[in-house]
Swiss-Prot record:
PANTHER family found in the cross-reference section: DNA-DIRECTED RNA POLYMERASE I SUBUNIT 2 (PTHR20856)
GO BP terms: DNA-templated transcription
GO CC entries: DNA-directed RNA polymerase complex
Record-linked Pfam families: RNA_pol_Rpb2_1, RNA_pol_Rpb2_2, RNA_pol_Rpb2_3, RNA_pol_Rpb2_45, RNA_pol_Rpb2_6, RNA_pol_Rpb2_7
CDD domains reported for this sequence: RNA_pol_B_RPB2 (cd00653)
Protein biosynthesis among keywords: no
Annotated protein name in UniProt: DNA-directed RNA polymerase subunit beta
GO molecular function: DNA binding; DNA-directed RNA polymerase activity; ribonucleoside binding
Signal peptide limits: none
Gene behind this protein: rpoB
Length: 1379
């Protein structure tokens, strides 16, 4: 069947080089942000049925609040959000926060307490909905609008709660001994550390305070010494047997040991093992099989063991020896003397089981629970005398109180996994068994069993996304509020109050505001282009509150870890101090409910790879063998090779194919979005790939976006998910299109309550956060049928729904007169003339008229002492016209400020009396264009305070806005009418009427002609016999009226908002914002780059005729230095050049075939050529089935150059590139003969020429160049400020002074240190001298010297300057320096 190109030929078709089929759908790229915040707010969930997560959990954890006496209680019932006051665009324009009011329903219960029995009965219940401040909402693109600017909350990586075992790598002690430690980290609450010291005693620390023996902690948990030993050691019973002792034979404790003396069977008396023989597992097994039960031992064998129980005389209660005491001759004598013939002994052999806990117990000074509790109390609260109650309460609150200690579900799950427990994840506090299990495992580690944890493993680090960060912040706010509520409940007459009176929501609202405004993780969105937006939202930062700091973070934390595979990109991270601390999520990764990053894998069942996709976190993945995505498969999904490269437990290895459990989904699941946009990434060195992915984020949107010839197939995904290109919300037919909006009549999803019309407003020349230009252009035409998700309009840096960050430029790699030395870039003038790399930047200027002490400032056109020429661009209100061309120093908004009265001379008074006052008491404070900025005014916004009269300009802007809203309403109304009346006439047709408008005959059969005789508004008067149809007519009428009134209401609300005054900062009467569009052509000093980290600065722009040219006379656009490739090892750019050259060659052929088709009407050669280019493969089939119109459209798209996609790690190889070159009729060396543009002579050797996708980066020379004459000075030091933003000067710094000193240039030096810097009096004198035409001046004392003197005085040194003039005689007496 002939296929048509998707809905309007406005979708780029690419030849696809990938060989690995895409099995899993790539998740939405900003899912991380949206899902997390939705889970926090749960707006969609019904009020009563919300699960205990997010905001619900916060309220549940703080409420109910009981007053101190227990006489009343405030309970939480539910919460809901009201619709936000302003929509996203209004908030952007008015500098507001996009937020919805949060209403919480609270229930106040008052109790009657019986004074005798203390029994409570409910006296009164009151319920009320209370306003709890505004909660910021997330926009559809995953951002927040705070005070009118878009911000992003970056996700934070932090150490997961749970238990971690580690050692100090032998650094703590000089012997290099490994000291093991365990740390229990809760989500909130006290940290518990358990650690060994160099003497192998086990200590515990709480919150990194002073250490106490771990046995004290165990005693505080209610254990005694014997119980502690019983928990950690096994017991053996030594029985008296004649002269010696019988000891049980336990082969498991003897493995690998040596028999020091001969071993004798206690039952038979025979020697079973000779002295000095090694006890191998085989030998021990033979002895067990022979039936050896017990060995004979002498007294010597008992010495050095420890008692497992107290040795007590039960009749008198006398304790001879305590559990844990060492057995030596003396103790043995005591035991035998008192007639004990059985001795319980601890199973400590110092080889497999160490005596650490026993040694700790004997070193511990605390004897019982009370001592231990007191000791812990003294550590936690030094200086306070402990009592049993206070000590017990404090100890319980540390780890066992859910209010203060929360492991979180994650912590509990991690703890269960590490310690082999199975506790419900609702148990969020520690238990005695948990602490025991931690100590046991730590001791086992010291005994050499088990492994320590790898803290950088992604199984031990988790992500806190927006929702969770917000939840923690809101909890803090509510806890602050809780204290105030409790106090108020106690102090107020509780019977008469409502919940509203108890609550002051300020702390909660302030916590939210503080988080969005000043948290380290709430960042100003990087909005240079769509890619930088998406990357910013997918960023993971290890910094921030509760995270690492740059200075403390070592090498290991920053390094790439095997578990990053498929979860965090190994390439994209900043260069500089943050390297490795700020990462990017990989393309297919997602964050699970516990906050761990998961990556998708295909299941392998019975040796065959299925399309069943499974998401696993790093912990879960460790046990599987995972094959690479590029492993070769047979048609049935089995592996071709006997041995397959795979990953297992962090190692890469070759393993037999039968052992495989999983397989990667796609080769690009390893890298981030930005890295996946680099073609031939696999041929680039990692350092350059890092620069390439970072520099794509800095590419400025150009005037004309152009998609790359050589892409990777990721481009449409980024354009769609970033929200730069507009996608259709639902299917429909395009009804109207102009530059500012698209109106679509919906054909699907037509619910009763929903409007049947979608209006898409396009952003025109809006300013982004980085001053780049956001502009959207429609792609559809009237009558187009669109489906859901189709691209309707291109945005900044998008071209037919593909991301387009730069332009395809014809590049030659060759030196050119030294102009491409050190990575400089040589450009052709054509690039400037054709606006290839021209971008538009929008600057915003705002001016406020305040109410000052001396009177209000005024925005006006009559400014004192300003010529009419300077006011030519201002309207009668004193505000610049839209479309005016402005340059540095031009007035944008005229403003005058009243100035203080100065005393007048009698003459002035006379003149004032004669000519009237006014002119002199104001000064000009107009807003002017800053130096170095030229541009065109594109937008002006005027904001007035409530009750301040609006000027002409404000009224005009308001009228325009209302007209726009009215047009939207009318269009929607027209489409509604057309739909409804169309359906109405269909229903009436063929029916017999029983009533109708005036003058209508009953019983007539209705037809189009009959009905059309009457005006539309009267059609509702027809009634028909068929009752079913009649009821449908009535339902339609109701639906129509409801839609109409809803439309009108929406319009009225918006108009009311427009006409209402604006919220203003205190003291501001009026505010004007002026937006200036600046057109920046490329010029020497601008920074450019390719996608492979090949960056450089434009050194010169050469006339076209001087540039090297090809045999057909085409001049190259860019000349790059060939020496930039070998040492940098980014060979991807060369492959891109060749492939781009082939694409352009094919494009030329297609262009010629289009001309041929126009001449002879035969489309077959064109179809064949396009078929040859596309080749075979899954993505190619649809192109082969295109109808003629679609083939022509595609050819038109491809005539400048064929679009191809070469996915990362699965792209075109050298053979493919050669095939493409041959297909295009070019040499497969990819080189061409070039001629020198200036002499016309041929260059000696062939030159590599081709197309590279070049980007212009947001480092423009216009933003950096800066000059200053007189400007602002620092108040204290009186030296000029620094930097362009402050209009500062160049610093003649310390090293420059040394240079002058070295040259002995005394006068220049004096000048630099005084009159040209901070000698205030000297500066004025120089100025006066220059004005007089005199060139003598005197240097005084620099201000910085005075500052130094003041600082010395502040340190208590009396420094005085003697101001004496020397006369001739004294001067001659001074010692001569030359002597």
């Amino acid at each position: 069947m002939a296929q048509t190109l998707s809905f309007n030929g406005r979708r780029r078709v690419r030849k696809f080089f990938g060989k690995i089929p895409e099995v899993a759908e790539m998740p939405n790229l900003i899912e991380v942000q949206k899902a997390s915040y939705d889970q926090f707010l749960m707006v969609e969930e019904p009020k009563g049925g919300r699960p205990d997560e997010g905001l619900q959990a916060v309220f549940k954890s703080v409420f109910p609040i009981t007053d101190f006496s227990g006489a009343s209680m405030l309970e939480f019932v539910s919460y809901e959000f009201e619709p936000p006051k302003f929509d996203v665009d209004e908030c952007r324009q008015r500098d507001l926060t996009y937020a919805a009011p949060l209403k919480v329903t609270l229930r106040l219960i008052v109790f009657d307490i019986d004074e005798d029995t203390g029994a409570k009965s409910i006296k009164d219940i009151k319920e009320q909905s209370v306003y709890m401040g505004d909660m910021p909402l997330m926009t559809n693109n995953g951002t927040f609008i705070v005070n009118g600017t878009e911000r992003v909350i970056v996700s934070q990586m932090h150490r997961s709660p749970g238990v971690f075992f580690d050692h100090d790598k032998g650094k703590s002690h000089s012997s290099g001994k490994l000291l093991f430690a365990a740390r229990v980290i809760p989500y909130r609450g006290s940290w518990l550390d358990i650690e060994f010291d160099a003497k192998d005693i086990v200590y515990a620390r709480i919150d990194r305070r002073r250490k106490i023996p771990v046995t004290s902690l165990l005693m505080a948990l209610g254990m005694d010494g014997e119980e502690i030993l019983d928990t950690f050691y096994t017991k053996s019973l030594y029985k008296r047997d004649g002269e010696g002792w019988r000891i049980p034979f336990k082969p498991e404790t003897l493995k690998g040991a040596k028999a020091i003396t001969e071993m004798v069977d206690a039952d038979t008396g025979e020697v079973v093992v000779e002295a000095g023989k090694k006890l191998t597992p085989r030998l021990l097994r033979q002895l067990s099989d022979k039936g050896l039960k017990a060995l004979k031992a002498g007294d010597d064998d008992l010495y050095g063991n420890y008692l497992a129980e107290d040795i007590v005389n039960y009749s008198t209660g006398e304790i001879y020896l305590e559990a844990g005491d060492e057995i030596d001759e003396k103790t043995l004598a005591v035991i035998l003397a008192n007639g004990f013939d059985e001795i319980p002994v601890l199973g400590i052999d110092h080889i497999n089981v160490g005596a650490y806990i026993r040694n700790t117990l004997s070193a511990d000074k605390n004897e019982n629970r009370q001592d231990a509790l007191f000791d812990i109390y003294r550590v936690m609260r030094p200086g306070e005398p402990p009592t049993m109650e206070s000590a017990e309460a404090m100890f319980n609150s540390l780890f066992f109180d859910a209010e203060r200690y929360d492991l979180s579900a994650v912590g509990r799950v991690k703890m269960n996994m590490r310690l082999d427990l199975s506790v419900e994840d609702t148990v969020r506090t520690l238990r005695k068994d948990d602490i025991l299990a931690v100590v046991k495992m730590l001791v086992e580690l010291r005994d050499g069993k088990g492994e320590i944890d790898d803290i950088d493993n992604l199984g031990n680090r988790r992500v806190r996304s927006v929702g969770e960060l917000m939840e923690n912040q809101y909890r803090l706010g509510l806890l602050r509020m809780e204290r105030a509520i409790k106090e108020r409940m106690s102090s107020i007459e509780i019977d008469t109050v409502m919940p509203q009176d108890l609550i002051n929501a300020k702390p909660a609202a302030a916590a939210v505001r503080e988080f969005f405004g000043s948290s380290q993780l709430s960042q100003f969105m990087d909005q240079v282009n769509p890619l930088s937006e998406i990357t910013h939202k997918r960023r993971l930062s290890a910094l921030g509150p509760g995270g690492l700091t740059r200075e403390r973070a070592g090498f290991e934390v920053r390094d790439v870890h095997p578990t990053h595979y498929g979860r965090i990109c190994p390439i994209e991270t900043p260069e500089g101090p943050n390297i490795g601390l700020i990462n990017s999520l990989a393309t297919f990764a997602r964050v699970n409910k516990y906050g761990f990053i998961e990556s998708p894998y295909r299941r392998i069942v019975d040796g065959k790879v299925t399309n069943d996709v499974l998401y696993l976190s790093a912990m879960e993945e460790a046990k599987y063998y995972v094959a690479q995505a590029n492993a070769e498969l047979n048609a049935d999904g089995s592996f071709v090779d006997e041995f397959v490269v795979c990953r297992h437990a962090g190692e890469v290895m070759l393993a037999p194919r039968d052992s495989m459990n999983l397989m990667d989904v796609s080769p690009k699941q390893v890298v981030s979005v930005a890295a996946a946009l680099i073609p031939f990434l696999e041929n680039d060195d990692a350092n350059r790939a890092l620069m390439g992915s970072n520099m794509q984020r800095q590419a400025v949107p150009l005037l004309r976006a152009e998609a790359p010839f050589v892409g990777t197939g990721m481009e449409p995904v980024v354009a769609r998910d970033s929200g730069a290109a507009i996608g259709a919300r639902r299917g429909g037919v395009v009804d109207q299109v102009d530059a500012t909006r698209i109106v679509i009549r919906a054909t699907e999803d037509l619910e009763a309550g929903k409007s049947g019309v979608d209006i898409y407003r396009l952003q025109k020349f809006q300013r982004s956060n980085q001053n780049t230009c956001v502009n959207q252009r429609p792609l559809v035409t009237v009558g187009d049928v669109v489906n859901r998700g189709d691209i309707l309009a291109d945005g900044p840096s998008t071209d037919l729904g593909d991301l387009a960050l730069g332009r395809n430029a014809l590049v030659a790699f060759m030196p050119w007169n030294g102009y491409n030395y050190e990575d400089s870039i040589l450009l052709s003038e054509r690039i400037v003339a054709d606006d290839v790399f021209t971008s538009i930047h929008i600057e915003e200027f705002e001016v406020m008229a305040r109410d000052t002490k001396l009177g209000p400032e005024e925005i006006t056109r009559d400014i004192p002492n300003v010529s009419e020429e300077a006011l030519k661009n201002l309207d009668e209100a004193g505000i610049v016209y839209i479309g005016a061309e402005v340059q540095p120093g031009d007035i944008l908004v005229g403003k005058i400020t009243p100035k203080g009265e100065s005393p007048m001379t009698p003459e002035e008074k006379l003149l004032r009396a004669i000519f009237g006052e006014k002119a002199s008491d104001v000064r000009d404070t107009s807003m002017r264009m800053p130096p170095g900025t030229y541009g065109t005014i594109v937008e002006v916004r005027v904001f007035n305070r409530h009750g301040v009269e609006k000027d002409e300009r404000a009224m005009a802007i308001e009228r325009e806005e209302i007209e726009r809203l009215a047009k939207d309403r009318d269009d929607e109304q027209a489409i509604l009418d057309r739909n409804v009346y169309g359906r109405l006439i269909d229903m009436l047709r063929g029916q017999v009427s029983i009533a109708g408008p005036k003058g209508f005959k009953k019983g007539t059969e209705l037809s189009n002609a009959v009905v059309s005789e009457y005006p539309r508004s009267q059609w509702w008067m027809f009634a028909v016999e068929d009752e079913k149809v009649q009821s449908e007519l009535e339902a339609l009428r109701g639906q129509y009226d409801e839609s109409k009134s809803r439309l009108e209401q929406r319009f009225m609300d918006k108009v009311e908002k427009v006409q209402r005054g604006d919220e203003m900062p205190p003291g501001v009467m009026k505010m004007v914002k002026v937006f200036v569009a600046v057109k920046r052509k490329i010029q020497p000093g601008d920074k450019m780059a390719g996608r492979h980290g090949n960056k450089g600065v434009v050194s010169r722009i050469v006339p076209v005729e001087d540039m090297p040219f090809l045999e057909d006379g085409t001049h190259v656009d860019v000349v790059l230095n060939p020496l930039g490739v070998p040492s940098r090892m980014n060979v991807g750019q060369i492959l891109e050049t060749h492939l781009g050259w082939a694409c352009a060659g094919m494009g030329r052929q297609i262009g010629e075939l289009i001309e041929a088709y126009k001449a002879n009407g035969n489309i077959e050669p064109l179809r064949k050529t396009i078929g040859d280019v596309v080749g075979a493969g899954p993505k190619a089939e649809q192109v082969h089935e295109f109808d003629d119109e679609s083939v022509l459209r595609l050819a038109d798209q491809w005539k400048r150059g064929v679009s191809i996609a070469t996915p990362v790690f699965d792209g075109a190889n050298e053979g493919d590139v050669n095939d493409m070159l041959r297909l295009a009729g070019l040499k497969d060396t990819g080189q061409s003969t070039l001629y020198d543009g200036r002499t016309g002579e041929q260059f000696d050797r062939q030159v590599t020429v081709g197309y590279i996708y070049m980007l212009k980066l947001n480092h423009l020379v216009d933003d950096k160049i800066h000059a200053r004459s007189i400007g602002p000075y620092s108040l204290v030091t009186q030296q000029p400020l620094g930097g362009k933003a402050q209009f500062g000067g160049q610093r003649f710094g310390e090293m420059e002074v040394w240079a002058l000193e070295a040259y002995g240039a005394a006068y220049t030096l004096q000048e630099m240190l005084t009159v040209k810097s901070d000698d205030v009096a000297g500066r004025t004198k120089v100025y006066e001298a220059i004005v007089r035409g005199d060139d003598t001046f005197e240097a005084g004392i620099p201000e910085s010297f005075n500052v130094l003197v003041k600082e010395m005085r502040s340190l208590g040194l009396s420094v005085e300057l003697e101001n004496t003039k020397l006369d001739e005689a004294q001067a001659t007496q001074l010692p001569d320096a030359a002597e």
